[in-house]
Curated annotation (Swiss-Prot):
This is Phosphatidylinositol/phosphatidylcholine transfer protein SFH12. It comes from the Eukaryota. The keyword Nucleotide-binding does not apply. One of its GO terms (cellular component) is Golgi membrane. Residues 120-294 form the CRAL-TRIO domain. Belongs to the SFH family. Keywords: Cell membrane, Coiled coil, Golgi apparatus, Membrane, Protein transport, Transport. Specifically expressed in flowers. GO terms for biological process: protein transport. The gene is SFH12.
């Protein structure tokens, strides 16, 4: 009881682990919340992993001590995403968090939704078809990109790189502030990841010129540094045999956790997509039944729970905030008063092994956040993700585009050009030498037969050398393309003179041909006249 009294007398002091050590205190606080106004609304499922809970709490305490935790970002799931992005390394995560706060201040990410007006959105979507459309069967928003229809040259003519980056950040902020909360309410559980579909049919070097690569590089840095761990799974559809072969090579440069989320499919992808996404939520051109005829087509409709006025009303009321799985019970712990000389120390090894861990219930009390996005995460809902924390890695997401995989596609396209004439047997042996997700029966059969074969190793230096050479060749093509298409006046004059002379010669040839025809006609008449005279002469001699 002494510990409880101390916690009540000093609600803003002491570590969370000390205050959470009392089982009775936890249950009493839970009861008070049940009678609160927040609990009067529909509960959103929130189950926290005990190990992740401790890691986030330690990270949160460290941020509080260094005054690096703004009230808006005092969010359990946001901190967990950053921890996963740095493999739960506290110092590296803290550095990443600090850089994120600095970037948001310099870029103006907190006000971009109100201040930025992207008037050229219709033209941009015309040359870069992309957008959210519906949700999958687990409630996550579905993001679609048709990379084969991207025209990066015309895209950069209707907008600038800086404006597109602003639009990209604005869409990311809208996703976290509007779309994820709406999906959380609709699914009755925490949602902060997306399902992505990349259609690579028709993808070539024309889709990824230097301007496109520069744009992808900037977007990839923004996403990876400031919006990590937002990709749940990705389907790359209409991938040819060359693409699938080179995917085996390129994925050796990626983290296994990332590759586990990426499924490369051929042109028979419809059944697999329908396993994950309901037919009514999938566009007709991807095998679904939705056309969004009244909204300008599926790629422009932005269909989803965020279009429902009732759901959006609940979002504005804060109903998407999690109601279970708390670490900190006292909102006063978010900031440290100036008169508080005590420091919050992380739990010792003895505390970690003590009974305090055992009394943590499966669903913890509510994570105490202000008006930030309080989502709840259920471990069983994560699809194709390795659950061990040690396997976590840095990963950027893409709201209108997951740029890390776009960079991968760009590299694969380049390699396709280089290995265009590889013999078929060599191609197949490389393609099926290691397991890669594919729904084609023939592909799976060949993969099983070649399971014991190994992929030829390609060093990073060789890969970069190929990319550098292709960049040089593309630069030369760009220079040639930049040359004026209008012929110089002197050469044009020479060409016109040659054409004029050719016309004269053609006329002379026609006149000569006519004269020759006339001569042949007269010759035939003379021959006929001579033959006639000969016959008359013979007849005269006969008589």
């Amino acid at each position: 009881m002494t510990l409880i009294q101390d916690a009540e007398l000093k609600p803003r002091m002491g570590s969370f682990k000390k205050r959470s050590s009392s089982k009775n205190l936890r249950y009493s606080m839970t009861k008070r919340r049940r009678s609160s106004k927040v609990m009067s609304v529909e509960i959103i499922e929130d189950v926290h992993d005990a190990e992740e809970l401790k890691a986030v709490d330690a990270f949160r305490q460290s941020l509080i001590l260094d005054e690096l935790l703004p009230e808006k970002h005092d969010d359990y799931h946001m901190m967990l995403r950053f921890l996963k992005a740095r493999k739960f390394d506290l110092e590296k995560t803290k550095q990443m968090w600090t850089e994120m706060l600095r970037w948001r201040k310099e870029f103006g990410a907190d006000t971009v939704m109100e201040e930025f007006d992207f008037k050229e959105i219709d033209e941009v979507l015309k040359y870069y078809p992309q957008g959210h459309h519906g949700v999958d069967k687990e409630g996550r928003p579905v993001y679609i990109e048709r990379l084969g229809l991207v025209d990066s040259t015309k895209l950069m003519q209707v907008t600038t790189m800086d404006r597109y980056v602003n639009y990209h950040v604005m869409e990311f902020e809208r996703t976290f502030n509007v779309k994820f909360p709406a999906c959380s309410i609709a699914a009755k559980k925490h949602i902060d990841q997306s399902t992505t579909i990349l259609d690579v049919q028709g993808v070539g070097l024309k889709n990824f010129n230097k301007a496109a690569r520069d744009l992808i590089t900037r977007l990839q840095k923004v996403d990876g540094d400031n919006y990590p761990e937002t990709l749940n799974r990705m389907f790359i559809i209409n991938a040819g045999s060359g693409f699938r072969m080179l995917w085996n090579t390129v994925k050796s440069f990626l983290d296994p956790k990332t590759t586990a989320k990426i499924h490369v499919l051929g042109n028979k992808y419809q059944s697999k997509l329908l396993e994950i996404i309901d037919e009514s939520e999938l566009p007709e051109f991807l095998g679904g039944s939705c056309t969004c005829a009244d909204n300008g087509g599926c790629m422009r409709s932005d269909k989803g729970p965020w279009k429902n006025p009732e759901i959006m009303k609940r979002v504005h009321n804060g109903d998407h905030k999690c109601s279970k799985g708390s670490q900190a019970e006292n909102s006063g712990e978010k900031t440290i008063p100036e008169e508080d000389d005590s420091t919050t120390e992380p739990a010792s090894e003895e505390e970690k092994a003590s009974k305090e861990v055992e009394i943590v219930p499966a669903a913890h009390p509510a994570w105490n956040m202000p008006e930030a996005h309080k989502f709840s995460l259920s471990k069983k809902e994560v699809y194709a993700i390795q659950e061990a924390c040690n396997n976590a890695t840095t990963e950027g997401g893409r709201s209108p585009i997951f740029t890390g995989v776009m960079a991968l596609v760009m590299g694969v396209v380049t390699m396709i050009k280089v290995t265009k004439n590889v013999p078929r047997k060599l191609t197949e042996s490389t393609l099926y030498s290691s397991p890669v997700y594919c729904d084609d029966a023939s592909m799976n059969k060949s993969a099983m037969q070649s399971e014991k074969m190994t992929v030829p190793a390609i060093s990073g230096e060789d890969f970069m050398a190929i990319m550098k050479r292709m960049a040089e060749l593309e630069q030369k093509v760009t220079v040639l393309s930049a040359q004026p298409t209008v012929m110089p006046p002197d050469k044009e004059e020479m060409l016109n003179a040659a054409i004029s002379r050719s016309n004269v010669l053609e006329q002379e040839l026609a006149a000569t041909k006519k004269a020759l025809d006339d001569s042949l006609g007269r010759q035939e008449e003379l021959v006929a006249y001579i033959e006639k005279k000969k016959k008359k002469k013979k007849l005269f001699n006969y008589w």
